Swiss-Prot record:
First and last residue of the signal peptide: none
Gene3D superfamilies for this protein: Nucleic acid-binding proteins (2.40.50.140)
Family in the record: Belongs to the universal ribosomal protein uS17 family.
Keywords: Ribonucleoprotein, Ribosomal protein, RNA-binding, rRNA-binding
PROSITE patterns given in the database record: RIBOSOMAL_S17 (PS00056)
InterPro entries (UniProt xref): NA-bd_OB-fold (IPR012340), Ribosomal_uS17 (IPR000266), Ribosomal_uS17_bact/chlr (IPR019984), Ribosomal_uS17_CS (IPR019979)
Annotated function: One of the primary rRNA binding proteins, it binds specifically to the 5'-end of 16S ribosomal RNA.
Protein name: Small ribosomal subunit protein uS17
Keyword flag Ribosomal protein: yes
Originating gene: rpsQ
Gene Ontology CC annotation, any one: cytosolic small ribosomal subunit
Domain of life: Bacteria
Assembly with partners or alone: Part of the 30S ribosomal subunit.
MF-aspect GO terms: rRNA binding; structural constituent of ribosome
Length: 87
């Protein structure tokens, strides 16, 4: 029997990497308001497990839902989509 993978995959930007093996990722979504039809921006922060400390502040990353790893961590880093440009 084959199991399906229904875990959420989100793309966002790293806003903090000060913790060991943990990053904070902000995911922004645009939703159309039901009554007025205006597009509204929402953002949410997710604490994410980063095993090798590869992601840095400003990087665009892809994260995936996983089992609870701690009190706040429910996501893990899948890949770094785009590295931040340091000026």
């Amino acid at each position: 029997m084959e199991r399906t993978n229904n875990r959420k995959v989100l793309t966002g930007r790293v806003v903090s990497d000060k913790m060991d093996k943990t990053i904070v990722v902000t995911v922004e979504t645009k939703v159309k308001h039901k009554l007025y039809g205006k597009r509204v921006n929402y953002s949410k922060k997710y604490k994410t497990h980063d095993e090798n400390n590869t992601a840095k502040i400003g990087d665009v990353v892809r994260i995936q839902e996983t089992r609870p790893l701690s009190k706040d961590k429910r996501f893990r880093l899948v890949e770094v989509v785009e590295k931040a440009v340091i000026i």
